[in-house]
């Protein structure tokens, strides 16, 4: 039973490390919000600038921000409210994709210490069972056995603590990325649906 617990702890640590590295590569700020797209959004002041923005977004089509801006740019003929609704629906989908894997880290945070505790309890039951069957108690051997058993709890905590740190960090980073993408998309939409300034009538000729 103890060996099964240790195997589960090793598997848990491998899964946790895999998702920590994978999310670290995916959630790079430059990959999600490329500076080139930020600059293009700043430069896109009028409908005539939209083709330039679309070209830049197509060059970075792996970015969630580029996909959102392309969606909004392709629907500029729609009413503003409908375009915003479509954009918000797609944004929720993109955020879910960014959060993929974080739930696994959250599960590992909860399950790793419990697996360690199970290993400790099973080991303690075995150790004290052997003591009960033995005619003489070897204190040194018992202490050594208990120390070995407690390693399961230590391993579980060593797996859970880094997972908790990275889960908290990645969760906060996704929130920050979502706010930045929302800000840039809102800025783009606001500019494209901005009412043109009223034309100033020509000055009346002065009476001679």
Model-derived features with residue positions:
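Hydrophobic membrane-targeting segments
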Residues: 1-38
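Pore-lining and gate-forming transmembrane alpha-helices of multi-pass membrane transport proteins
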Residues: 6, 140-167, 171
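Lipid-exposed faces of alpha-helical membrane segments in multi-pass integral membrane proteins
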Residues: 8-21, 108-118, 159
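Short alpha-helical segments used as structural interaction elements across diverse proteins
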Residues: 20, 25, 94-97, 148, ...
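Generic hydrophobic alpha-helical membrane-segment signal
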Residues: 4, 10-11, 94, 98, ...
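Short, strongly hydrophobic alpha-helical membrane anchors
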Residues: 1, 136-138
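Hydrophobic/aromatic residues in alpha-helical transmembrane segments
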Residues: 13, 20, 120, 124-127, ...
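Predominantly long cytosolic amphipathic alpha-helical stalk/bundle segments
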Residues: 30-118, 122-136, 168-208
């Amino acid at each position: 039973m103890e060996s099964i617990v240790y195997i589960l702890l090793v598997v848990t640590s491998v899964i946790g490390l895999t998702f920590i590295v994978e999310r670290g590569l995916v959630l790079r700020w430059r990959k999600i919000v490329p500076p080139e797209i930020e600059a293009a959004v700043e430069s896109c002041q009028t409908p005539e600038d939209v083709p330039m923005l679309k070209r830049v977004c197509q060059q970075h089509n792996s970015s969630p921000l580029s996909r959102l801006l392309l969606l909004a740019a392709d629907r500029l003929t729609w009413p503003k409210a409908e375009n915003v609704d479509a954009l918000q629906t797609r944004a929720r989908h993109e955020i879910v994709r960014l959060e993929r894997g974080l739930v696994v880290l959250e599960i590992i945070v909860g399950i790793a210490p419990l697996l360690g505790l199970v290993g400790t309890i099973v080991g303690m039951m075995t150790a004290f069972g052997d003591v009960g069957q033995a005619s003489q108690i070897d204190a040194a051997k018992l202490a050594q056995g208990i120390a070995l058993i407690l390693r399961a709890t230590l391993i579980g905590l060593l797996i859970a603590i880094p997972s908790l740190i990275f889960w908290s960090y990645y969760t906060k980073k996704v929130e920050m990325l979502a706010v930045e993408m929302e800000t840039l998309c809102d800025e783009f939409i606001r500019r494209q649906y901005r009412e043109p300034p009223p034309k100033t009538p020509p000055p009346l000729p002065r009476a001679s």
